[in-house]
Amino acid sequence: MTCYRGFLLGSCCRVAGGRAAALRGPGAGGPAARPRLGGDGGGRRHLGQGQPRELAGCGSRADGGFRPSRVVVVAKTTRYEFEQQRYRYAELSEEDLKQLLALKGSSYSGLLERHHIHTKNVEHIIDSLRNEGIEVRLVKRREYDEETVRWADAVIAAGGDGTMLLAASKVLDRLKPVIGVNTDPERSEGHLCLPVRYTHSFPEALQKFYRGEFRWLWRQRIRLYLEGTGINPVPVDLHEQQLSLNQHNRALNIERAHDERSEASGPQLLPVRALNEVFIGESLSSRASYYEISVDDGPWEKQKSSGLNLCTGTGSKAWSFNINRVATQAVEDVLNIAKRQGNLSLPLNRELVEKVTNEYNESLLYSPEEPKILFSIREPIANRVFSSSRQRCFSSKVCVRSRCWDACMVVDGGTSFEFNDGAIASMMINKEDELRTVLLEQ
């Protein structure tokens, strides 16, 4: 074992001790043939029984089927691969990695098993495509770039919701389909993916694409403009930052190089679109976020809070839902107070409490195709200086001026932009940014 490897294992011991071919269908014109896309181009589940309320009536019926020629498959990085990459410079053997994971309370065999399940399902997807004469490129996060997206007629995200968000982040062409396949249904919810039955029967999904037996779901996304003084439009990949600080340092160096500029820069359209949400707040969660906010070009309001979340209909069942949802305990307490204050003879049984709770929580969800933003203020501070007139509200445009010291603006949990004092972010929905996805029946 090298000295560095020994140092890593030794450090963990001390911590542990302290704690105890071308893609073409029938009639395609060859490898270079472009896809025939159905549909009219307008317009964190699926049609059929048990379909969530927020997707009821969504999507446009495909017309003529969908036959792409080239597909890029974006495969997620499994936890096993992530741990290998974290310690790649230490040159750990598999046995060393096993010991290191055990010291951290993680199961090496469990991670390896999930990795094999994911890998097997990715191979199933690729084999299914190639059996149809499809030209396929398999890429990981680091290899997934704009050139790869331009090459492909369609993008398949092989993983879970996080992989779907990654795959969508590079696709700015509203006509290019992005399809999610859950490669580990036992461990991943996969709200944005095809129904789990297609994980092991992907050829059936392909045949439905060919026959047009699906609907297009046009998911709205948030576009972001950044302007003001000392802004840094260089994005930081938070996944890569976990593995290495090099990228983050490069972004900081670029920021420092421009830090001396006092003049304000005009609005810059950022090269990402938010499919789920945008979060704005101090990097240190224990520090209050100070900012000014304007909704739909209204007056500016100074606020302090734990940050704010701006989501789409797609993201309304993700982080935003968990920020705003209420528990049955809170509903029961409120109803009891209302009963006492209003002298109501309301039968407060468990059935009523759960019904009220569910109806309120379901009201937080809306269709991914609706062109509106739901912004939520997290834990707003209310005193004689600061207030929040609206803790949650639908809007078409939100502008935020930072008064923070070390804040960030995070898009879909994966891409971060510095957002400090003087920076102004404008967020809105534009039809050109909608993402073309697929709805298949269960």
From Swiss-Prot:
It is an enzyme of class 2 (transferase). The modification N6-succinyllysine is found at residues 76, 302, 317. The modification Phosphoserine is found at residues 188, 367. The modification N6-acetyllysine is found at residues 76, 317, 397. Gene3D superfamilies: Probable inorganic polyphosphate/atp-NAD kinase, domain 1, Probable inorganic polyphosphate/atp-NAD kinase, domain 2. GO terms for molecular function: ATP binding; NAD+ kinase activity; protein homodimerization activity. SUPFAM superfamilies: NAD kinase/diacylglycerol kinase-like. Its EC number is 2.7.1.23. Residues 24-36 have a biased composition (Low complexity). Inhibited by NADH, NADPH and NADP(+). It is linked to 2,4-dienoyl-CoA reductase deficiency: A rare, autosomal recessive, inborn error of polyunsaturated fatty acids and lysine metabolism, resulting in mitochondrial dysfunction. Affected individuals have a severe encephalopathy with neurologic and metabolic abnormalities beginning in early infancy. Laboratory studies show increased C10:2 carnitine levels and hyperlysinemia. Belongs to the NAD kinase family. This is NAD kinase 2, mitochondrial. It comes from Homo sapiens (Human). The gene is NADK2.
